[in-house]
Amino acid sequence: MSEFSQTVPELVAWARKNDFSISLQVDRLSFLLAVATLNGERLDGEMSEGELVDAFRHVSDAFEQTSETIGVRANNAINDMVRQRLLNRFTSEQAEGNAIYRLTPLGIGITDYYIRQREFSTLRLSMQLSIVAGELKRAADAAEEGGDEFHWHRNVYAPLKYSVAEIFDSIDLTQRLMDEQQQQVKDDIAQLLNKDWRAAISSCELLLSETSGTLRELQDTLEAAGDKLQANLLRIQDATMTHDDLHFVDRLVFDLQSKLDRIISWGQQSIDLWIGYDRHVHKFIRTAIDMDKNRVFAQRLRQSVQTYFDEPWALTYANADRLLDMRDEEMALRDEEVTGELPEDLEYEEFNEIREQLAAIIEEQLAVYKTRQVPLDLGLVVREYLSQYPRARHFDVARIVIDQAVRLGVAQADFTGLPAKWQPINDYGAKVQAHVIDKY
């Protein structure tokens, strides 16, 4: 950034308004550096809480600190990193207690880059992907054309290293900035709901829909260009297979493939996590509305009783006992008086109670593929099963089918290192990425 777009008073007011502060002592800074180093060695760019604790243990040993309180001090350090916006924490309702951590742009800026702030722009992303596609196509054409070492350095390695890789890093940074924006939107929604949730409903809906739309727009743009980018990378990789002296090009292509897979994968995972948060907020609003109805009725009833002598009123009721049973949990005890006994066909059965039975049925049905040595396409099989169940059961049924399928065998395509295509498994946007199982 060659020049500042804001004046000093504006920057000071902005920093004061957002209450920015960073406090990193030497041990905490060392911990952040250790996290960044280990994170750079991972292909998915994500770390679990256990991996963060292991990194903290190395730092603690280096500073000759006691190992008796390592768990408590590591937890405090992780929470402090999250509070200072150096790490982002993501939790999932399906994997309760297992959090995913990613370095924020601020964390990356401290350890590797200079700090940058950018707004998400679909046009900018489309232009970046267009430039990448052009560079990759020219590099692939040059690779298939062949030539001496200077030709490979000038026309293949250089564009991949200094153009494609940098744009991939820029897109990755954009995604991390979107992570930060999601956390800010969550904070804004929490503040709105704490003040006056009735007046905040429309604002919350706007924030939720805007963020969902932005995430979907980002992912759609990436997926639309992802196949073409991977195809050109594969062309370059095929061209280097006959040359033993081009390991540096082959390694760079592999790194670019990993970056592209990580970008697209995290985009879809981020959407799934945001959908869970969206449902949580809507559930909270619905609960608040139900509670508010009861609160308004109780308040009016108290006022009517208090002003009875000034403004007399009469109350007509059909069942005196029903007037006393105003709490939902007490009314639940009287349901049988209203509905009577349900027929056996309508008796509700918890899904967990039939889980083992369903797993056994699916295991028996899938065993036919192994017996006949027929390839098993998970995308088609899961979609066929989900069409037989309501949408609320799709996640549980899909998990059972996949668990049983992977026990039968493996896909030989997994050993090639190439990613499988995403296949839709229902009409609500759910997808699965898996090669065809053909070795039992």
UniProtKB/Swiss-Prot annotation:
GO terms for cellular component: cytoplasm; nucleoid. Interacts, and probably forms a ternary complex, with MukE and MukB via its C-terminal region. The complex formation is stimulated by calcium or magnesium. It is required for an interaction between MukE and MukB. The gene is mukF. Belongs to the MukF family. GO terms for molecular function: calcium ion binding. This is Chromosome partition protein MukF. It comes from the Bacteria. Its main location: cytoplasm. Keywords: Calcium, Cell cycle, Cell division, Chromosome partition, Cytoplasm, DNA condensation. It is found in: Cytoplasm, Nucleoid. Involved in chromosome condensation, segregation and cell cycle progression. May participate in facilitating chromosome segregation by condensation DNA from both sides of a centrally located replisome during cell division. Not required for mini-F plasmid partitioning. Probably acts via its interaction with MukB and MukE. Overexpression results in anucleate cells. It has a calcium binding activity. Gene3D superfamilies: Chromosome partition protein MukF, middle domain, MukF, C-terminal domain, Winged helix-like DNA-binding domain superfamily/Winged helix DNA-binding domain. It comes from Shigella boydii serotype 4 (strain Sb227). The lineage of its organism: Bacteria, Pseudomonadati, Pseudomonadota, Gammaproteobacteria, Enterobacterales. GO terms for biological process: cell division; chromosome condensation; chromosome segregation; DNA replication. Residues 208-236 are annotated as: Leucine-zipper.
